[in-house]
């Protein structure tokens, strides 16, 4: 299984295009195969690999995806500096829990205040939907807040369910997360301003408008 996945990548069947991104999904993948694949890909930060209950998802992000991800992180870190909020950026690090059969590589993630094993905030840029529930993965990992940037809109979720439960009891339709309009981790962040600046293609203009809105 791992060898065939590696051959798929080596054969460039997952392309790195400008506007399109590809998703490869395989079921019945063992945890060992998942970890072996991560080890094979450790020097290639381009791919995002997610795992849930034996289903493996490899995403090859488009250039547009990476542009949005970079701009999002850039603006958010400007907010942290402006408000003197201590943070630890963890980028697209791999987080996994063998006992809970879950693993993810977010587009961006952060610890707030101090370094932790699991980030407080995970952010996903969604241009193409996969079949794995990212919220269920993040619930099992214990990530407190998850943001999705989709169709020029930010969707925010805060964990209400006990991540130790086998299945979500609170807010089961959204895997234990409540949909929120204001970040509970970063209540000072003006979401409307953030969204508006993320749609500005010129990064300098986006930063200027965002910083003006912060002042």
Kindly give the residue locations of the regions a language model identified:
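C-terminal interaction segment
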Residues: 2-19, 74-78, 85-141, 148-215
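Short amphipathic alpha-helical segments
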Residues: 30-33, 64, 68-71, 130
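Short secondary-structure junctions
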Residues: 40-45, 80-88
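His/acidic/aromatic-lined binding-pocket segments of jelly-roll/cupin-type domains
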Residues: 49, 146-147
């Amino acid at each position: 299984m791992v060898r065939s996945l590696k051959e798929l990548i080596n054969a460039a069947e997952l392309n790195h295009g400008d506007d399109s991104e590809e998703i490869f999904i395989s079921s019945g993948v063992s945890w060992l195969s998942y970890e072996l694949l991560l080890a094979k890909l450790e020097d290639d930060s381009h791919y995002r690999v997610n795992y849930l209950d034996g289903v493996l998802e490899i995403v090859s992000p488009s250039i547009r995806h990476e542009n949005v991800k970079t701009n999002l992180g850039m603006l958010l870190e400007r907010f942290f500096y402006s408000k003197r909020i201590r943070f630890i950026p963890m980028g697209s690090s791999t987080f996994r829990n063998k006992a809970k059969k879950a693993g993810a590589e977010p587009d961006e993630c952060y610890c707030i205040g101090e370094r932790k094993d699991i980030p407080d905030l995970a952010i996903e840029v969604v241009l193409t939907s996969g079949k794995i529930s990212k919220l269920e993965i993040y619930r099992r990992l214990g990530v407190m807040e998850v943001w999705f940037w989709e169709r020029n809109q930010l969707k925010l979720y805060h964990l209400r369910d006990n991540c130790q439960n086998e299945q979500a009891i609170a807010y089961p339709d959204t895997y234990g997360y409540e949909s929120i309009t204001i970040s509970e981790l970063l209540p000072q962040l003006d979401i409307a301003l953030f969204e508006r600046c993320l749609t500005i293609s010129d990064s300098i203009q986006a930063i200027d408008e965002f910083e003006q809105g912060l002042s």
